[in-house]
């Protein structure tokens, strides 16, 4: 083994937080702090390994330096294919780098410093609200996982950057590490909340939470990088505790048992990294036995030491103390070489070069896939939801229902099935301690395949067996006895003696892990699906609020929420008083602390925006706080139960909350009134706890569930609207209709954002094939778009409404008929329907539809026809849209004892504006007079009546403000119709239209007698009303009259 520390690898004496070796072992990347920025550097690996290349001036050492990050880079990771490099930083961004042709200058040097390779940022991923601490590419580069101090893990679609597939919320502390299961079935994340969460990648639900090994841990590490073994059998965590001493916890895939760990480091373990491949080595005893196969991993700690472990050894292969001057933060293995690199906060890296005799040789990818197939029945590269779920134990399909699987024993001699697999050899050391040596079961062609792992679990002298064969062997059905020549494990003393092992700290006297932790027995016949916690207990949060925290009245927990420049730090159980525990909330911005707030009950949920902070407690109380001053905006509100989600509308004018018992409330903050009060208990009973919750600017709630269903509430229908379902219609409808800039249009497209984020689109991508004819697909897509239009009208989402009208136009132009197209266009030319569609600007949509239809040459005739109709409609509506007659009204008998027929003009027309400005005019000898003022007017028609002033004459001045009433009836004035198009505008100044002649307000009107006029009773002959040829126009003084009868 050679230990190399190249001094020329540095970040100008700044910290290096991450290192990763490229798949071809020709280069490696480092990430850390630069000069007032975050820095990513790609280095040539050859000068590190070769002294000749190091001193050759023609061999470049630094290949490329990228300083585009605004803050320190915490993690760099190469993709599996080596084409992409991902970097995560304190600036909340993730950048995806790709190599481009030519060379470039180092950013910020003015071209003085040249890069030998050109790497450019092709994608910038935005979604985290805090520092990004760790990254991990999935097998086959399907996804990229990132974790942050905002307590979330985001799954990015690596095939469609910058789209995200899911946001995993469940941690209540800073998430400091993520790792993919090599089979693609699970994703593990480790957090400061003293837990590891296992997520199911098939539906991104929480599968299991592991807390026991971390109960004594503190948040003393910058990162917590955990790692899966290459065979998928074991997950090794970072910082754990055993008997007061730091350990690296071993978690078995079978039942998630946690009874074994690596011990010996004096301070917290910060990072763990398995070699990417299963290693093999021929035994050195000269026997012709098959090669020994095992896994290898490295462990780094805050005690500045590095240890390398092999599953075929009872002790660490090598331990190097004081390798750096500060904590070790990252580790990486060379996939093609026996190479290990580590980096430290002190700004340096170290490289350990092993020989194949020392470390072993990596088996080929085909051999590793064969091992995976034998253990799981499927090649792991097809996992991650791209096909059927990985079957953990395919032999179970062969078992009759009700039968229990039997063990398939193996022996280490030619006598078949003489001893059970758990047989071990036990010896005594000189000091009286027991040494238990497990029997090694090598890989062979005829029997089940496994990797034996012997791991130090307490002190340096005693070992505990961890055999992956127990999972596979324990589930095989009974079969004919098979002879196998198992080779007992050899300690490989000659190999170990060549290397200075060093000594782990022997002062740690810990009890065996089996005594410390009691794991539930795992039934091999029980599916792993049964080990999940109930869905109703998984309080996953929405995209708009942190998750509902699992806290108790006396429990302690901390979490941070950030938005823009503001940051809220919550500490439950901060202070203990004689009346109970107090929770503390601290608000700060980028410069200073703003305020402190104490709550008498633990906080289980909170959210914040630019103006306000929402605090929800365990006792069901809710507090709305001003972010600037910390003063309450609302008094404390009591809810029926604690809040699961809370969210602000995008414009910060509304705030909503959803409780555990299904209570939904939305408040208007400025008016301090409730905007919506509803219940969704029936939805919770049907789908479980809500996973997403948000509020639109129009006050519409959007609720999403882990099942893929999402809903919104309609106050007019008093019902829940179905926004999304997880079926083929939804998948095919959304497919191909997402805008290219969807990530920037989430606030303008609330419906589509909810549908895309509820896993209806991404969970089907690549896993569902449409094998049937296209006829149903075309019909289904058109009907889906039509339903989307109705949903947009209900949500009052105008931008989305225009988008779906374009989509429907394109589909009808491509697959529709002329009859169907005409029905669609005629509807847009019609007047808006009362109720939910009043806000729809139909003429604007019509223009948009015609623009979309114009490129289709086969529809030119229809386009020209409806273009002319649109022009005529605009012209007519400009004249009539604000003078729409009121619905026919019935009245009591007039003084003449008769009433006019429905729909006929009878007496006079009175026009008002907002109840304040009005101009009254009489219709003389059947002539019609309409008055238009400002931007909207209304016209009412009364029955036969007499108009008189209240004892004084009226004068006309300015635009005039008057009110008129009938002596025989009183009619309600309908609300004005909204403007449907920018082209339809009222005139800037008031105008009076008399017999189709338009006069401006400044024009001189014909002289009118302003004295009171007696109007003769209406005549019913011929159905027409007759009046005296005189009229009065009221001026600034209102005209009042006595009412004798009212309808």
UniProtKB/Swiss-Prot annotation:
Top-rank lineage group of the source organism: Eukaryota
SUPFAM superfamilies referenced in this protein's UniProt entry, alphabetically: WD40 repeat-like
Compositionally biased spans, kind Low complexity: 933-972, 1015-1047
Pfam family, one: Hira
InterPro entries xref list: CAF1B_HIR1_beta-prop, G-protein_beta_WD-40_rep, HIR1-like, HIRA-like_C, HIRA_B_motif, WD40/YVTN_repeat-like_dom_sf, WD40_repeat_dom_sf, WD40_rpt
Location (main, coarse): nucleus
One GO cellular component term noted in the UniProt record for this chain: chromatin
Subcellular location: Nucleus
Molecular function via GO: chromatin binding; histone chaperone activity
Keywords: Chromatin regulator, Nucleus, Phosphoprotein, Repeat, Repressor, Transcription, Transcription regulation, WD repeat
WD repeats: 11-53, 68-107, 127-166, 170-209, 218-263, 264-319, 323-364
Role summary: Required for the periodic repression of histone gene transcription during the cell cycle. Required for replication-independent chromatin assembly. Promotes remodeling of sperm chromatin following fertilization via the incorporation of histone H3.3 and histone H4.
Family of this protein: Belongs to the WD repeat HIR1 family.
Name this protein carries in UniProt: Protein HIRA homolog
Organism expressing this protein natively: Drosophila melanogaster (Fruit fly)
């Amino acid at each position: 083994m050679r230990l190399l520390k190249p001094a020329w690898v540095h970040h100008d004496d700044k910290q290096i937080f991450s290192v990763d070796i490229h798949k071809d072992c020709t280069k490696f990347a480092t990430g850390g702090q630069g000069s007032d920025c975050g820095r990513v550097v790609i280095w040539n690996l050859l000068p590190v390994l070769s002294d000749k290349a190091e001193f050759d001036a023609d061999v470049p050492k630094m290949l490329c330096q990228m300083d585009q990050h605004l803050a320190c880079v915490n993690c760099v990771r190469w993709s599996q294919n080596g084409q992409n490099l991902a970097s995560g930083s304190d600036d909340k961004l993730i950048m995806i780098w790709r190599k481009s042709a030519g060379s470039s200058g180092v950013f910020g040097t003015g071209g003085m410093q040249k890069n030998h390779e050109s790497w450019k940022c092709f994608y910038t991923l935005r979604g985290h609200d805090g520092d990004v601490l760790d990254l991990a590419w999935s097998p086959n580069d399907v996804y990229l996982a990132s974790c942050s101090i905002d307590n979330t893990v985001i799954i990015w679609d690596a095939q469609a950057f910058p789209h995200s597939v899911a946001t995993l919320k469940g941690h209540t502390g800073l998430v400091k590490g993520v790792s993919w299961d090599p089979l693609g079935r699970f994703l593990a994340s480790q957090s400061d909340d003293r837990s590891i969460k296992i997520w199911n990648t098939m539906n991104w639900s929480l599968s299991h939470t592991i807390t026991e090994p971390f109960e004594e841990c503190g948040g003393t590490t910058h990162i917590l990088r955990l790692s899966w073994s290459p065979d998928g059998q074991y997950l090794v965590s970072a910082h754990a505790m055993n008997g007061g001493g730091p350990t690296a916890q071993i978690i078995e895939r079978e039942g998630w048992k946690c009874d074994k760990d690596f011990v010996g480091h004096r301070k917290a373990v910060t990072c763990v990294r398995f070699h990417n491949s299963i290693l093999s080595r021929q035994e050195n005893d000269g026997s012709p036995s098959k090669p020994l196969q095992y896994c290898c991993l490295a462990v780094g700690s805050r005690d500045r030491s590095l240890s390398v472990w092999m599953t075929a050894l009872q002790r660490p292969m090598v331990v190097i103390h004081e390798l750096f001057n500060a904590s070790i933060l990252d580790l990486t293995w060379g996939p093609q070489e026996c190479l290990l690199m580590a980096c430290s906060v002190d700004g340096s890296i170290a490289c350990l070069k092993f020989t194949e005799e020392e470390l072993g040789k990596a088996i080929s990818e085909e051999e590793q896939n064969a091992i995976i197939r034998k253990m799981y029945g499927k090649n792991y590269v097809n996992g991650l939801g791209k096909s059927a779920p990985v079957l953990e134990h395919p032999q179970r399909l062969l078992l009759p229902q009700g039968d229990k699987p039997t063990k398939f024993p193996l022996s280490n001699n030619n006598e078949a099935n003489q001893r059970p697999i758990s047989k071990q050899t036990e010896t005594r050391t000189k000091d009286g301690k027991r040494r238990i040596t497990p029997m090694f079961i090598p890989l062979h062609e005829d029997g089940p395949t496994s990797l034996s792992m012997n791991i130090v679990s307490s002190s340096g002298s005693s070992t505990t067996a961890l055999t992956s064969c127990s999972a596979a062997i324990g589930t095989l059905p009974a079969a004919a006895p098979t002879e196998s020549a198992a080779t007992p494990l050899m300690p490989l003393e000659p190999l170990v003696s060549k290397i200075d092992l060093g000594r782990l700290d022997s002062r740690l006297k810990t009890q065996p892990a089996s005594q410390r932790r009691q794991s539930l027995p795992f039934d091999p016949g029980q599916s792993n699906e049964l080990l999940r916690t109930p869905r109703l207990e998984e309080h996953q949060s929405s995209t708009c609020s942190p998750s509902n925290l699992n806290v108790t009245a006396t429990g302690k927990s901390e979490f941070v929420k950030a938005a823009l420049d503001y940051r809220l730090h919550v500490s439950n159980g901060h202070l203990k008083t004689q009346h109970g525990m107090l929770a503390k909330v601290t608000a700060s911005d980028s410069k200073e602390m703003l305020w402190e707030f104490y709550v008498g009950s633990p906080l289980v949920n909170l959210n914040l925006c630019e103006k306000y902070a929402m605090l929800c407690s365990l006792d069901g109380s809710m507090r709305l706080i001003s972010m600037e001053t910390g003063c309450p905006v609302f008094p404390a509100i009591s809810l029926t139960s604690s809040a699961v989600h809370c969210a602000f509308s995008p414009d910060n004018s509304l705030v909503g909350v959803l409780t555990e018992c299904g209570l939904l409330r939305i408040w208007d903050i400025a008016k301090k009134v409730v905007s919506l009060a509803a219940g969704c208990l029936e939805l919770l009973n049907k789908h479980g706890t809500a996973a997403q919750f948000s509020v639109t600017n129009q006050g519409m709630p959007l609720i999403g569930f882990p099942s893929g269903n999402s809903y919104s509430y309609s106050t007019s229908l008093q019902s829940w609207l179905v926004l999304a379902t997880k079926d083929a219609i939804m998948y095919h409808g959304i497919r191909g209709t997402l805008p290219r800039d969807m990530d920037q249009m989430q606030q303008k497209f609330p419906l589509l954002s909810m549908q895309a984020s509820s896993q209806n689109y991404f969970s089907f991508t690549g896993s569902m094939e449409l094998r049937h004819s296209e006829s149903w697909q075309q019909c289904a897509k058109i009907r889906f778009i039509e339903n989307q239009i109705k949903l947009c009208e209900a949500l009052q989402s105008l931008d989305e409404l225009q988008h779906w009208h374009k989509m429907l136009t394109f589909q009808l132009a491509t697959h529709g008929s002329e009859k169907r197209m005409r029905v669609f266009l005629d509807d847009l030319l019609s007047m808006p329907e009362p109720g939910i569609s009043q806000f729809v600007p139909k003429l604007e949509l019509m223009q948009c539809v015609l623009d979309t239809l114009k490129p289709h040459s086969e529809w030119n005739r229809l386009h020209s026809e409806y273009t002319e109709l649109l022009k005529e409609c605009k012209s007519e509506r400009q004249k009539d849209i604000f003078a729409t007659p009121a619905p026919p009204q019935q009245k009591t008998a007039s003084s003449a004892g008769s009433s006019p027929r429905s729909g006929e003009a009878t007496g006079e027309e009175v026009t008002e504006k907002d109840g304040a400005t009005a101009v009254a005019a009489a219709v003389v000898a059947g002539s019609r007079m309409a008055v238009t003022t400002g931007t909207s007017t209304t016209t009412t028609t009364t029955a036969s009546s007499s108009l008189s002033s209240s004892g004084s004459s009226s004068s006309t001045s300015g635009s005039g403000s008057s009110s008129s009433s009938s002596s025989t009836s009183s009619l309600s004035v309908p609300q004005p119709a909204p403007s449907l198009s920018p082209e339809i505008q009222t005139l800037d100044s008031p105008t009076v239209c008399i017999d189709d002649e338009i006069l401006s307000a400044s024009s001189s009107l014909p002289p009118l007698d302003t004295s009171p006029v007696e109007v003769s009773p209406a005549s019913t002959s011929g159905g027409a009303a007759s009046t005296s040829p005189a009229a009065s126009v009221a001026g600034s003084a209102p005209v009042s009259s006595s009412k004798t009868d009212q309808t």
